[in-house]
């Protein structure tokens, strides 16, 4: 597989996991409405259990479907593990970003350049690293193009009325 395609094929579960809570979310907040020592919400109402578990499921399923379509990994079980870890890492990275944004007193949905685009990506790569990784050049490519993809998908989600703001 060409290195550019390999990079995107590898990270696709994280991309899907990160974007699907916009559609699947709602319900009980992950922080259960609790506040941190600074009196601000830990994550906020926009980070919900349904969105987190939905994103984890979608990201993992995307990886399994990818493995069926094009066997990239030596086994389906490895594809499942890597996809699960990429999805989990993306969602945890997004939660960390929300936590930081709340500490900076930024409202939910407010853009934080770099944090929104790279936080989920770096966390996903770190979570999956013990099981499988990609070459450094492909990681660098993803660091460059992910902000553009993130911006484009946010604009699309806004136009589809899945998001109230285009960022």
From Swiss-Prot:
Catalytic activities: 2,3-bis-O-(geranylgeranyl)-sn-glycerol 1-phosphate + CTP + H(+) = CDP-2,3-bis-O-(geranylgeranyl)-sn-glycerol + diphosphate
Reported cofactor(s): Mg(2+)
- Which pathway, metabolic or otherwise, does it act in? Membrane lipid metabolism; glycerophospholipid metabolism
Tell me which UniProt keywords the record has, alphabetically: Cell membrane, Lipid biosynthesis, Lipid metabolism, Magnesium, Membrane, Phospholipid biosynthesis, Phospholipid metabolism, Transferase, Transmembrane, Transmembrane helix
Q: Which GO terms describe its cellular component?
A: plasma membrane
Membrane topology, as annotated, equals:
Multi-pass membrane protein
One GO MF term, please?
A: CDP-2,3-bis-(O-geranylgeranyl)-sn-glycerol synthase activity
Tell me which domain of life the UniProt entry assigns to the organism this sequence originates from.
Answer: Archaea
Primary subcellular site in the record, as a coarse category? membrane
Enzyme category, top tier: transferase
Q: Which InterPro entries match?
A: CarS, CarS_archaea
* UniProt record similarity statement: Belongs to the CDP-archaeol synthase family.
Task: Quote the NCBIfam families the UniProt record gives.
Answer: PRK04032.1
PANTHER family tied to this protein = CDP-ARCHAEOL SYNTHASE
Annotated function: Catalyzes the formation of CDP-2,3-bis-(O-geranylgeranyl)-sn-glycerol (CDP-archaeol) from 2,3-bis-(O-geranylgeranyl)-sn-glycerol 1-phosphate (DGGGP) and CTP. This reaction is the third ether-bond-formation step in the biosynthesis of archaeal membrane lipids.
User: What protein name is recorded for this chain?
Assistant: CDP-archaeol synthase
């Amino acid at each position: 597989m060409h290195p550019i395609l390999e990079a995107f094929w590898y990270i696709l579960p994280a991309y899907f996991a990160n974007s699907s809570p916009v559609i699947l979310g709602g319900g009980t907040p992950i922080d259960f409405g609790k506040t941190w020592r600074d009196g601000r919400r830990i994550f906020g109402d926009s980070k919900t259990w349904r969105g987190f578990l939905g994103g984890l499921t979608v990201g993992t399923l995307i990886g399994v479907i990818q493995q069926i379509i094009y066997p990239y990994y030596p086994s389906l079980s490895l594809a499942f593990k890597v996809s699960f870890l990429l999805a989990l890492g993306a969602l945890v990275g997004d939660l960390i970003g929300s936590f930081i944004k709340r500490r900076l007193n930024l409202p939910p949905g407010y853009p934080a350049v770099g944090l929104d685009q790279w936080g989920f990506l770096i966390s996903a790569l770190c979570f999956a690293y013990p099981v499988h990784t990609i070459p450094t050049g492909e990681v660098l490519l993803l660091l460059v193009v992910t902000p553009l993809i993130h911006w484009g998908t946010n604009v699309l989600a806004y136009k589809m009325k899945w998001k109230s703001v285009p960022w």
